[in-house]
Amino acid sequence: MAPKPPSGTSSRAWDAVNPPLSEWVLDAVSSMGFTRMTPVQASAIPLFMAHKDVVVEAVTGSGKTLSFLIPVVEKLLRLEEPIKKHHVGAIIVSPTRELASQIYNVLTSLLAFHPASAAVINTSETEDVPRPKHSSSVLRVVPQLLLGGSTSPAEDLSTFLKRSPNLLVATPGRLLELLSSPHVYCPQSSFEMLVLDEADRLLDLGFKETLQNILRRLPKQRRTGLFSASVSEAVDQIVRVGLRNPVKVVVKVKGASGVDDKRTPASLQMTYLTQPPTGKFPALKHILNSVQPTPSKSIFFVSTCSGVDYLSVILPLILGNDFQLIPLHGKHPANVRQKNFNRFVNAHNPAILLTTDVASRGLDIPSVDLVVQIDPPSDPKTFIHRCGRAGRAGRRGLSVVLLHPGREEDYVSFLEVRKTPVAPFPHPITVSDAEAAAATETARKVVKADRAIHDRGQKAFVSWLRSYSKHQASSIFRVADLDWEGLGKAWGLLKLPKMPELKNFKGDKTLGVQMDWDTYAYKDKQREKRRLELLQEMAESGQQQTTNKKRPNETVAWSNNAENRNKKAKRRDMKQVRQERKRWEKMTEEEKKKALETEQMLEQIRAKNEEQRRLKRAAAKADKDAEEGGDEEFTGFD
């Protein structure tokens, strides 16, 4: 990569950019409250506007969005002539629906200060009609947002054909579907710029193939910008994207030593707290109460979608009524995700977003004061992105990662090596045994009230363990070191699930809970009705329903065991016959002929071997008889 050229001025004033920004852009950023550029904006905007490919790595919350939106908009509005109908001039790709929506909202806020573009956007948002008639010589930016799950591909194409947007903000899958249409054009004469936001995530395996298909549909002669908080960890993949001698912009933050060794904002305090499993959830309440002033918005990260579903039921009971807890994960339907996201963003009372890594990247949620990582991320790269939801744009923020005592504490040194140092949580927190036991009983009370919540908890625990076992720092997060009983009690489980990992566990899998599983009911009447019907059917068929592991009957007669073995052998033989019949039916006549010849040859060999074994047995018997006869005692003649 080409080195970054020296800047002509040390000023970060917006009017000092070279080439100069348009007057309406200066008005827009001033109205948004941005008095001067952030370091990443001061570095990236001039380069991107000067027709350079850029790879931008900057700490999260440093203003990367405007770093690419302003150059893209300026480029489209400085063309010699408007882009042709149904031709695309620029594309911004984002890994998630939420982040794409956020970029689109910032874009429309920016374009509100450009009269021609604002007129088109306002019309398209209020009426489902083609864009208003303007002089064909008027340059304007017409954006379209493409999100999977919110509209159908046919609806997106219809909107594209009606409004003829020249700037697309999209998630990868939906963008590829639109570009695959013969009615959408991206020729070299029209297409100008491609932006990959959160570039390292877009280049992950889940998006790699889709991204490659998108790039095949775009001209190679284009300006490309890659923006992320950790671009350096995907350099090999970035080079293959097709950038031409890109300029790399790296913006870091000075640590306490004065060296540029941190990859997070200086306004963000990153800490860790060590708690045993039973103390983790009660400690959350202590954390919330220790932060002053009380956090208006907090984000709690867990590792799985099932974990969000289950903990969203029990955590409010442990935390109390002072905070509104809102769940969000990637398996929610698109409308539920958007609804819950908006609830959190617009919440006036203290709110907590309980989420997975779907909310860890790029989202600029205002006023997030606290981030708690209940589960450390399985991918260490995600750690910095989770922390970065707080402390954005200079606002003070606090991040806490919860660790179990022992080997997990080595994660602190691991993060230090990765230039994301964490300090001990500044306020000592001690969770008493009585408080931990009370939290367990509080959770179990709601679990006992509805068998559906029990099922949800069992699923969530298994899912959590699967995620834990796949941690990339596997030498630190070891399944063998887990406190099973402590974890089960912490989660409010009534028993430990059946899992291969518990095969050699010698502890109490019932967790000290006595339950009548036959009478343990679902609140949902239909589910309970089905359960009772199944219970009745099993009772009538002589089977006993139990959720515990079946214990062997120590008084079973040998004859019953022999009968069971005979039944199994018979079933095995029948299965083998069916498989052989299916194999025979698939054969050609020639194959059948060869198979018969082979079988006949094998029969001859078997017969020959059996005859040899028979002769050997006969000879052995004769030798034995002779030996026994020779040893007889002589008793004399008659």
UniProtKB/Swiss-Prot annotation:
Motif Q motif: chain residues: 14-42
GO molecular function, one term: RNA helicase activity
UniProt KW Magnesium keyword: no
One annotated GO biological process: assembly of large subunit precursor of preribosome
Keywords from the UniProt entry: ATP-binding, Coiled coil, Helicase, Hydrolase, Nucleotide-binding, Nucleus, Ribosome biogenesis, RNA-binding, rRNA processing
Pfam family, one: CTT_SPB4
Residues the entry annotates as binding ATP: 58-65
Span of domain Helicase C-terminal: 283-437
Motif (DEAD box): 197-200
Skewed-composition ranges (Basic and acidic residues): 574-597
Keyword rRNA processing (UniProt): yes
Coiled-coil regions listed in the entry: 521-629
Bias (Acidic residues): 625-638
PANTHER family tied to this protein: RNA HELICASE
Record-given protein name: ATP-dependent rRNA helicase spb4
